[in-house]
Amino acid sequence: MESSFTQKDMLAQVNQLWSMLDDMAENSPESYQKFIQRHMKEGKEFMTPPEPNLCIHTKILEPDEKILFINICQWNRVPAPMSEAHPVPISAGQLENLSDGTVVAIAYNPEVLKRAHQDHVELDQLIRLAMKYIEEQYQITLCHSYHVAPFQLKGNAKMMKESLERIQKQPATNKGNSSCATDNSLLEELKSIALIREKQETSPSICITREDAPKSTKTKLIEEISSTDLQNRDLLPSPWHELSVTKDNAGHPQSLILKVKLRGVHSVAECDLSVSKDDLLLVVPGRYRLLLNLPQAVNEETVAAKFNKANYILLVTMPTL
């Protein structure tokens, strides 16, 4: 299906982008410099190709027994975990058949591998995480024993890079829509900066609504998704957050207060928040996913949330039952 994003639309977006950049350069030179420098740095890091780190030698047991080489590499496109308590993001390439076995590329953030090489236990955990991910991704069974190959890379760097990038491009909608989304993202960021410059104030409350359903039914917490969507959601990092309990004079829980730092988010429209009596789910598509079991039952009908664009803080207030 061809994209409806035409050349005329793209030209209009570009003109709007330049207009807003000119306005920022004139009215807020410091913000303009920071904006340009950050995007140049991010662009440079994003374009850095994956670098081989070590190669693991093991075996595929099922469906067919064969040698497997796992090229573990470092790549800036893979984010670092938000904290030590958060899951480690991972990216995998495609299984490629060679004359003497099969090879697959696994990418971690450079800082993750740097720390792992200082601790043999942590490095072993990363290797086993990679093996488990490969088993689940490709529905195969691996031998749980392995050894580190005497070389860093099986195959060549070009094949490894292409394999990882093919996976990153899936699931693709179409190039036109992707370009449109990128342009809109930049425009939204510029609009947000301009808005913050004009007024440092909190945005209106997020409206949390529920469809007519029995009260025991959780809203939006169960959703049928494809296997690809499931993989993508599991890989999304959890944002920094802080959950506190306010109590009345008698010491009884009165409400739960959740603070969430959503860097890179500029509008409440990007957030999908669902709260039930005993848990909370926050999703920012393509950026963050946070699922919390609440320590106290809350009144889901009176939950309120506000997003402060100036500091990227989402504040959720949940009165207890």
Swiss-Prot record:
Q: Which domain of life is it from?
A: Eukaryota
Instruction: Enumerate the InterPro entries for this protein.
Output: PIH1/Kintoun_subfamily, PIH1_N, PIH1D1/2/3_CS-like
The family assignment reads: Belongs to the PIH1 family.
Mind telling me what this protein is named? Answer: PIH1 domain-containing protein 2
